[in-house]
């Protein structure tokens, strides 16, 4: 089963907009209260927190029953990945609706349960969104507020496609900062444009932050969203190209398991830490995984250790083999190649040694 998030804009009037605003405000206030209770009592399972706080929360915040249940689930989900501190939620945080409080009517409208009753909302979407909503099965939805507009991010389920032919072997993909991705066939996707945009955004952000006003804060949020959209678009193009290439070559895809890499970069200098912090490898990997799943291609994750130091011809591993960021020369056999292509070859070889090629994704990539 493939699940995709389809975002559509909601058409509202004064009455329905007020209902959504009130629902969002109460829902997130309830999440904050529930989070405080969960933290103080160390109650992080939804079943246990429900018994402790459901009735009190529903009465205090005047939430419908199912929205109270969803607030409990949202709070507990945040503690699944981080229990080191008490979590807080902004007044415009996403509101989660499931099948009991959200229902599509065709593909152009949806019913939502709010604090002011059940309302029917008209949805504004394009041809691609209409196609996805009509072909898949809708699940839960998130209510979002972005730049003064309300959106629904709807989870749409699609059946698994037939498995593609992978008799051609494996296409290894090395991900990096200078070259965002390099495959074992030698094709690279430069990160120069992304780096230039990030540098411009960082300087712009510095100028805006100096003003310290509410309008500057809103401007800063807009800048961050724009930079994020640009990065996601670049990753979309790269992942689409790689999956299409693998499909044509009848190959499976192999990626590095880079979970925890930012924590290991804590000893780097300030510039390198900034680059690592802005490296959207998880987004690229996630896009490759879901696009490969849509194409019926398996993806395998391999151990990334020493892929850039090991010769893909003779297997000799030495830090000195890596002459520079872009250059690799084996001290044992003299093999010379682009360092990223050599690493991609090693990733390919490790994947081929795996017991089996399965549809696999690393949960840590999406944390």
Positions of PLM-derived features:
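Nucleic-acid substrate recognition interfaces
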Residues: 1-367
């Amino acid at each position: 089963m493939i699940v995709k998030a389809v975002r559509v804009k909601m058409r509202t009037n004064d009455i329905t907009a007020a209902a959504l605003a009130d629902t969002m405000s109460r829902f997130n206030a309830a999440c904050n209260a529930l989070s405080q209770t969960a933290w103080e009592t160390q109650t992080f399972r939804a079943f246990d927190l429900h018994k402790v706080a459901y009735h009190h929360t529903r009465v205090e915040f005047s939430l419908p029953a199912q929205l109270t249940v969803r607030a409990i689930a949202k709070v507990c989900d945040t503690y699944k990945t981080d229990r080191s501190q008490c979590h807080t939620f902004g007044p415009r945080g996403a509101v989660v609706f499931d099948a009991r409080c959200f229902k599509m009517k065709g593909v152009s409208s949806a019913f939502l349960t709010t604090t002011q009753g059940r309302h029917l909302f008209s949805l504004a979407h394009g041809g691609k969104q209409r196609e996805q909503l009509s072909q898949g099965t809708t699940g839960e939805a998130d209510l979002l507020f972005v730049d003064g507009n309300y959106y629904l991010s709807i989870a749409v389920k699609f059946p698994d496609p037939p498995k593609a032919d992978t008799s051609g072997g494996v296409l290894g993909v090395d991900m990096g900062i200078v070259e965002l991705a390099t495959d074992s066939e030698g094709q690279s996707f430069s990160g120069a444009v992304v780096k230039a945009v990030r540098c411009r955004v960082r300087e712009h952000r510095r100028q805006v932050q100096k003003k310290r006003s509410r309008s500057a804060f809103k401007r800063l949020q807009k800048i961050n969203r724009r930079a994020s959209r640009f990065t996601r678009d670049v990753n979309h193009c790269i992942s689409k190209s790689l999956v299409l290439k693998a499909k044509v070559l009848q190959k499976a895809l192999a990626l590095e398991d880079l979970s925890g890499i930012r924590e290991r970069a804590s000893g780097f200098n300030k510039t390198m830490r900034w680059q690592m912090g802005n490296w959207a490898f998880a987004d690229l990997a996630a896009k490759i995984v879901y696009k490969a799943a849509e194409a019926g291609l398996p993806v395998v994750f391999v151990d990334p250790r020493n892929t850039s130091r090991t010769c893909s011809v003779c297997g000799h591993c030495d830090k000195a083999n890596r002459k520079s960021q872009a250059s690799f020369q084996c001290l044992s056999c003299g093999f010379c190649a682009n360092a990223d292509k050599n690493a991609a070859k090693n990733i390919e070889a490790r994947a081929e040694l795996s017991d089996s090629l399965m549809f696999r994704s690393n949960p840590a990539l999406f944390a």
